[in-house]
């Protein structure tokens, strides 16, 4: 059984002995995994750590502002807007596995540029057990696991043996705000794994707004306290609809809500029908490009939590 205090002491010592007096950067996303890893690394090497937040243009609504506000005064913090670079590389790509690999590669290219600039030798990552288990099992690549050959930086992964519930325990022991610890997981590739087919700026905005509506309604209902994840997926399916008395043709959006303890398995709970109806009405009313909303009822397995 995990003893948070013992784990923290051992992890800090391991990071310190590995990095020594060298400089390191950490890939900070604002999620609980990278946040916990950043605090552990900060305790171990202090000012020799630089936290790098990369905006790849695929973040959920308000995410960049949240991360900057939360971490800019806590750590040596660098914000990098690399959205143009990521979106250019993703042009015309439809295969979800290829999207994940491209995003992982571009992340590393950005981190290596920053590392060269500040003279860092190590890259600290918030990789956790489900990430590498799914990657090694060839279920899907994770951006922080499928790293390119020839990587210059040496990787440090202080929480790679932990599951999400254990990471949250460590976060609480470290004194991180409960609000941060309990945030629902958001995938490293961002909305790229919630957009089926080619990624375009129009699709990103549609998916971002649909996700925001789902999050707002779930939090308002209080159901967020029992759910692992809740989000919207923009499919590549176009469906006929009616706006007023006129035929319309727009996208199909899928709502997904699951319960889980560690992301290795997940189940779809009994959901309040009035909540689903509210979400559906808001999405079709507030996002004119969407004509239909569906609900995913598949557990993991056989499905994965994210669509792509």
From Swiss-Prot:
Keywords annotated in UniProt: ATP-binding, GMP biosynthesis, Ligase, Nucleotide-binding, Purine biosynthesis
Domain GMPS ATP-PPase: 2-183
Binding annotation for ATP: 29-35
Catalysed reaction equations from the record: XMP + L-glutamine + ATP + H2O = GMP + L-glutamate + AMP + diphosphate + 2 H(+)
Pathway: Purine metabolism; GMP biosynthesis; GMP from XMP (L-Gln route): step 1/1
EC number: 6.3.5.2
Gene3D superfamilies per the UniProt record, alphabetical: 3.30.300.10, HUPs (3.40.50.620)
GO CC term (a single one): cytosol
Class in the EC hierarchy, top level: ligase
Assembly: Heterodimer composed of a glutamine amidotransferase subunit (A) and a GMP-binding subunit (B).
InterPro entries cross-referenced by the UniProt entry: GMP_synth_C, GMP_synthase_B, GMPS_ATP_PPase_dom, NAD/GMP_synthase, Rossmann-like_a/b/a_fold
Name of protein: GMP synthase [glutamine-hydrolyzing] subunit B
A Pfam family reported for this protein in Swiss-Prot or TrEMBL: GMP_synt_C
Purpose of the protein: Catalyzes the synthesis of GMP from XMP.
GO MF, one annotated term: ATP binding
CDD domains referenced in this protein's UniProt entry, alphabetically: GMP_synthase_C
NCBIfam families named among the record's database cross-references: guaA_Cterm
């Amino acid at each position: 059984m995990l003893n948070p205090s013992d784990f923290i002491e051992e992890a800090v010592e391991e990071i310190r002995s590995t990095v020594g007096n060298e400089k390191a950067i950490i890939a900070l996303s604002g999620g609980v995994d990278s946040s916990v890893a950043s605090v552990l690394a900060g305790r171990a090497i202090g000012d020799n750590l630089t936290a790098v937040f990369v905006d790849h243009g695929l973040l959920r609504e308000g995410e960049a502002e949240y991360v900057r506000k939360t971490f800019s005064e806590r750590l040596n913090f660098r914000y990098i807007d690399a959205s143009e670079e990521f979106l250019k590389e993703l042009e015309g790509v439809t295969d979800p596995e290829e999207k994940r690999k491209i995003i992982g590669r571009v992340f590393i290219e950005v981190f290596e540029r920053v590392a060269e600039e500040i003279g860092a030798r190590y890259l600290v990552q918030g990789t956790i057990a489900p990430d590498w288990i799914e990657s090694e099992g060839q279920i899907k690549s994770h951006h922080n696991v499928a790293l390119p050959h020839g990587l210059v930086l040496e990787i440090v992964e202080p929480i790679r043996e932990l599951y999400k519930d254990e990471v949250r325990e460590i976060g609480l022991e470290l004194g991180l705000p409960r609000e941060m610890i309990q945030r629902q997981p958001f995938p490293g590739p961002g909305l790229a794994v919630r957009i089926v087919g080619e990624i375009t700026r129009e699709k990103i905005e549609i998916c971002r707004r649909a996700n925001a509506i789902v999050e707002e309604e779930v939090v308002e209902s209080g159901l967020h306290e029992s759910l692992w994840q809740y989000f919207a997926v923009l499919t590549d399916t176009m469906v006929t609809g009616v706006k007023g008395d006129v035929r319309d043709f727009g996208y199909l959006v899928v709502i997904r809500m699951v319960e889980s303890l560690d992301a290795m398995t997940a189940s779809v709970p009994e959901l309040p029908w009035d909540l689903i109806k509210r979400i559906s009405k808001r999405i079709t009313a507030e996002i004119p490009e969407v004509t239909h909303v569906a609900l995913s009822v598949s557990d993991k397995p056989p499905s994965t939590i994210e669509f792509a």
